[in-house]
Amino acid sequence: MTTMRYQLELFFTALGFFTRLPVPAWVPWSPERLNHAARFFPLVGWVVGAIGAASYLAFVQLLPPALAVLLSMAVTIRATGAFHEDGWADACDGLGGGWDRLQVLTIMKDSRIGSYGTAGLVLMLLAKAAALVELAAHGNLQVALALLAAHPLSRLASTSLIHTMQYVREDESAKSKPLARRLSATELVVAAVFGLAPLALLAPAEALAALTATAAATLWAARVFARRLGGYTGDCLGAAQQGSELACYLGILAAWNFI
């Protein structure tokens, strides 16, 4: 198998795992391949960001920016199957309602959403929508560029946790168990290239603010996960992606306020 073919298969493996988008039938799947596919998680963000940006630019031709933002968010949620939003809600439930490590992990594994998860999910969606609507005041293209930058960067944030932290679930049936192996330095560099490259679409001040805010959110999340759990779970990765995505939007907004 050629190296290029193998890398393409890994990308499609990541795309099939993290989205509901169809992938070619010839792409094989295995836990080992999913683990190695982690390097392409930010590249999946390129696809999701492009879907969101294209949807927004299409909807805003017919509708007010606020409605266009909501509809574009609905499209990206549909494309990903609310994969990361589910992780955010589970993390909110577990960290909000659990007193010790075991209880937090047990609550996070429960498929039912609780009060913390509901409140956290609603607030997250409202915050992202509000941030994007505010960005629309600076031009519709600004919203599209923010989406193109935030989705890859936030997935790089999640990927960095796989490299720096321990996976803490012992359940072999856990959906994210194949991600338990730490990324190599080379794999992290590949992920970083795909995660950081879209920042070039932004003005320098915006890119710096987005990167700073995202890094701060990721470090804070990692500290919370380490203190409460001693590592990360799949839900933690989803929560980190959601929090980092919001942080990216807020960083861009902050840059606009000081330009």
UniProtKB/Swiss-Prot annotation:
Disulfide bonds: none
Pathway in which the depicted protein is active: Cofactor biosynthesis; adenosylcobalamin biosynthesis; adenosylcobalamin from cob(II)yrinate a,c-diamide: step 7/7
Membrane-crossing residue ranges in chain numbering: 10-30, 40-60, 113-133, 188-208
Top EC class for this record: transferase
Biological process, per Gene Ontology: cobalamin biosynthetic process
Keyword list, A-Z: Cell inner membrane, Cell membrane, Cobalamin biosynthesis, Magnesium, Membrane, Transferase, Transmembrane, Transmembrane helix
Chief location category: membrane
GO cellular component: plasma membrane
Family classification: Belongs to the CobS family.
Job of this protein: Joins adenosylcobinamide-GDP and alpha-ribazole to generate adenosylcobalamin (Ado-cobalamin). Also synthesizes adenosylcobalamin 5'-phosphate from adenosylcobinamide-GDP and alpha-ribazole 5'-phosphate.
Protein's UniProt name: Adenosylcobinamide-GDP ribazoletransferase
Annotated source species: Aromatoleum aromaticum (strain DSM 19018 / LMG 30748 / EbN1)
